[in-house]
């Protein structure tokens, strides 16, 4: 059964600070520096995608915090992989409502105690993506390819044979489920946030399909080989932040007709500044290979899944997730109730809401043991 958790009303202050997370162009203040903070690029030669296509050189950008700690056998026992959402990058975890709540002294992933790995997912940020120059000739990738690239980073570049935990939000949460299934003996604990272990369908698929079809049918798209950015699809782009925000938050932001129309135009402009049409198309369509439900029996890691009651992408009335999580031995599902301190799907940007569950998960597991 889902377990509701009442979180402090003070989180309403944090909610305002996190609103910009839905749009990369609305940059947050400069992030703090954490112990051992390092950025790097991992290059894979002749990366093979699951459909058979290859890329001569695939780049995966990543950030690490802290230092590896070795156990008596010489194995690293404090590595945690953090995975971001669809329209984000590793920078998602360094805003004021995330980084200090996660990596600061005494926090769940205190960078003086944990070795934290945060990659830019394939197709995003500093990692290889269509807008680098290949445009629509960039190989079609799915979540399976994204996870494969992450695994190569962790094992080949960083030399790790084990992860203490995989934690992800939205798309990153879905990929956390995939990690638990694909590499069941590699991970101690998994925390998927704001997602479900089922194929993209229903309203979740419909709004994604509307956006991708708007791009594909934009007369300026030119089959992905456009010389100037397509413009027409942008008028549907507000669907994205609308689905990320709660109804209460949107009503508060736009309580009148003029305010709502002004918000709409601001969303269109933010999309124009933030997104390349090909990159966005690939982001959304990469989710269509996601379907962990048939392989949930393979999961050995301790799982603590967290969703939010006012999340329009993962509606609370769809109770399948509680049943599916219950089918995984030792797994637990938490449904955080809606309140002053929640933002719908974007509550994932408020680490203060979900970090108590991360603390619980890490306490309930030990390195290389469950």
Regions found by a protein language model. Give the residues of each.
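Conserved alpha/beta-hydrolase "acid-adjacent" motif
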Residues: 312-319
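Alpha/beta-hydrolase-fold enzymes
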Residues: 186-270
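Catalytic active-site module of serine/aspartate enzymes centered on a nucleophile-bearing elbow/loop
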Residues: 330-370
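Conserved acidic catalytic loop of the alpha/beta-hydrolase fold
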Residues: 144-164
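Short beta-strand/loop motif that positions the catalytic acidic residue
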Residues: 299, 305-307
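Conserved hydrolase catalytic core segment
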Residues: 162-202
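N-terminal cap/lid subdomain of alpha/beta-hydrolase-fold enzymes
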Residues: 63-132
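Catalytic-loop region of hydrolases
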Residues: 27-80, 90-91, 96, 367-370
């Amino acid at each position: 059964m889902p377990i509701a958790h009442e979180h402090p009303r003070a989180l309403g202050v944090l909610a305002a600070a996190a609103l910009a997370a839905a749009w990369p162009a609305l940059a947050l203040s400069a992030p703090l520096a954490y112990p051992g903070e390092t950025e790097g690029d991992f290059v894979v030669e002749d990366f093979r995608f699951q459909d058979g296509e290859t890329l001569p050189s695939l780049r995966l950008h990543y950030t690490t915090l802290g230092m590896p700690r070795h156990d008596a056998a010489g194995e690293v026992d404090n590595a945690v992989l953090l995975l971001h959402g669809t329209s984000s990058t590793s920078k998602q975890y360094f805003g004021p409502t995330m980084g200090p709540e996660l990596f600061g002294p005494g926090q769940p992933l205190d960078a003086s105690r944990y070795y934290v790995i945060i990659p830019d997912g394939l197709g995003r940020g500093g990692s290889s993506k269509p807008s680098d120059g290949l445009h629509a000739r960039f190989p079609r990738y799915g979540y399976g390819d994204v996870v494969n690239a992450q695994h190569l980073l962790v094992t080949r570049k960083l030399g790790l044979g084990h992860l203490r935990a995989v934690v992800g939000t939205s798309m990153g949460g879905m990929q956390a489920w995939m990690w638990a299934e694909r590499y069941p003996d590699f991970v101690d604990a998994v925390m998927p946030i704001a997602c479900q272990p089922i194929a993209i369908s229903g309203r979740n698929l419909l709004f994604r399909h509307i956006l991708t079809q708007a791009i594909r049918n934009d007369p300026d798209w030119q089959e992905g080989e456009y010389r100037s950015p397509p413009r027409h699809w942008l008028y549907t782009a507000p669907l994205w932040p609308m689905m990320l925000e709660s109804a209460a938050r949107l009503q508060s932001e736009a309580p009148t007709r003029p305010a709502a129309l002004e918000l709409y135009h601001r969303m269109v402009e933010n999309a124009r500044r933030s997104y390349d049409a090909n990159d966005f198309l690939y982001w959304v369509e990469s989710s269509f290979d996601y379907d962990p439900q048939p392989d949930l029996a393979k999961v050995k890691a301790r799982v603590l899944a967290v969703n939010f009651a006012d999340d329009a992408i993962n509606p609370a009335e769809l109770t399948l997730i509680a049943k599916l999580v219950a089918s995984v031995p030792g797994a637990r599902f938490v449904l955080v109730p809606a309140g002053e301190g929640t933002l719908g799907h974007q509550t994932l940007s408020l680490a203060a809401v979900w970090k108590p569950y991360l603390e619980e998960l890490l306490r309930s597991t030990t390195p290389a043991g469950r």
